[in-house]
Amino acid sequence: MKTFLFLFAVLFFWSQPRMHFFFFDEKCSRINGRCTASCLKNEELVALCWKNLKCCVTVQSCGRSKGNQSDEGSGHMGTRG
């Protein structure tokens, strides 16, 4: 009986930290991020994951999309002077 109680206590307390860490990974995946040791050049750090990993999300470019051609032919070069 003591062995059963001991194993139950060990398994119960062992599962608690793992559930806590799962929360961080779930939060990162909800924002389409990935947990990794370091972010790439085209990624930004948006949150922290477990075991000192970083939640990195790909940076969206702020340039005009292919479908947006409203300023084409206006003579504007798009550079700052």
From Swiss-Prot:
GO terms for biological process: defense response to bacterium; innate immune response. Residues 62-81 are annotated as: Disordered. The gene is Defb34. This is Beta-defensin 34. Only expressed in epididymis (caput, corpus and cauda). GO terms for cellular component: extracellular region. Disulfide bonds join 28-55, 35-49, 39-56. It is found in: Secreted. Pfam families: Defensin_beta_2. Belongs to the beta-defensin family. Residues 62-72 have a biased composition (Polar residues). Has antibacterial activity. Its main location: secreted. Residues 1-20 form the signal peptide. It comes from the Eukaryota. Keywords: Antibiotic, Antimicrobial, Defensin, Disulfide bond, Secreted, Signal.
